[in-house]
């Protein structure tokens, strides 16, 4: 494809007991593009890898540096390195992280956790990470599972901060809401479905609903700042190519 996809969102949707992984791209102009689907969960390494390999087979170059925005799946994270290389920046979904942490805390601690974590996300990467490590140390005493959840993949919660992107763009690139919002459209279209017969049925409904929704896609919030992301990705790719040339002699 000649479309310059800068961002790839990948997240899983659930229909009854069946799962579908979805990939949506954002080009340099902020326009969204449905890239592909695969039946299965993001936690399934084989399924995650197959989806990404299918994207490259259909024209998404594995040599262009991109920002990947994903849920917290370790299998999906590994698949990105395997298919597209370890040099691509990866942003873990902040909403997934927040929900996971809250799941380990009693309700009377939810407000404090939300305000602390969200405040840290507004800081520079190093300062924000330090704040959350400090909070995790406090949680460790009585809620070790919450502390462990918070610290898991902590650095990749701040990838967009390290890239120096403005807050308006970070709000869109910090979560997989872009896919979650499309999932709402899928749920609306499939509201009358009372029984999901199999994974193939879930996959077909997802593809049809996304295809219909794609016609009404709007550009992402903060799209006017995407040139900054493109510049950072291009610079990183040039530096890497230069390093490889020097190494090759």
Regions found by a protein language model. Name each.
Residues 79-80, 105, 161-162:
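Short, well-ordered secondary-structure micro-motifs
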Residues 122-249:
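Acidic/histidine-rich catalytic cores and adjacent linkers
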Residues 39, 53-56, 60, 118, ...:
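A broad detector of the eukaryotic-type serine/threonine protein kinase catalytic domain
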Residues 98-127:
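Conserved phosphate-handling catalytic cores of large alpha/beta enzymes
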Residues 3, 42-49, 62, 70-77, ...:
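Amphipathic alpha-helical transducer elements in NTP-driven molecular machines
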Residues 1-70, 74-86, 178-179:
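RNase H-like nuclease fold core
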């Amino acid at each position: 494809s000649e479309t310059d996809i800068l961002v790839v969102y990948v997240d899983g949707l659930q229909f009854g007991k069946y799962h579908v992984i979805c990939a949506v791209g954002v080009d340099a102009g902020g326009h969204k593009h449905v890239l592909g689907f695969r039946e299965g969960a993001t936690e399934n390494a084989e399924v995650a890898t197959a989806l990404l390999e299918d994207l490259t087979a259909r024209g998404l170059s594995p040599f262009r540096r991109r920002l990947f925005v994903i849920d917290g799946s370790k299998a999906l994270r590994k698949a990105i390195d395997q298919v597209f290389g370890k040099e691509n920046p990866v942003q873990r979904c902040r909403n997934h992280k927040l929900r996971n942490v809250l799941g380990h805390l009693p309700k009377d601690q939810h407000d404090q956790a939300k305000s602390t974590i969200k405040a840290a996300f507004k800081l520079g990467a190093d300062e924000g990470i330090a704040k959350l490590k400090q909070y995790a140390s406090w949680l460790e005493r009585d809620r070790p599972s919450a502390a462990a959840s918070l610290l898991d993949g902590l650095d990749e919660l701040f990838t967009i901060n390290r890239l120096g992107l403005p807050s308006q763009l970070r709000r869109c690139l910090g979560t997989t809401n872009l896919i979650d919002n499309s999932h709402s459209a899928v749920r609306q279209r499939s509201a009358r479905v009372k029984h999901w017969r199999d994974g193939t049925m879930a996959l077909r409904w997802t593809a049809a609903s996304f295809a219909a929704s794609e016609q009404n896609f709007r550009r992402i919030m903060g799209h006017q700042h995407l040139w900054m992301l493109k510049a950072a990705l291009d610079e990183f790719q040039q530096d890497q190519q230069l390093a490889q040339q020097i190494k090759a002699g």
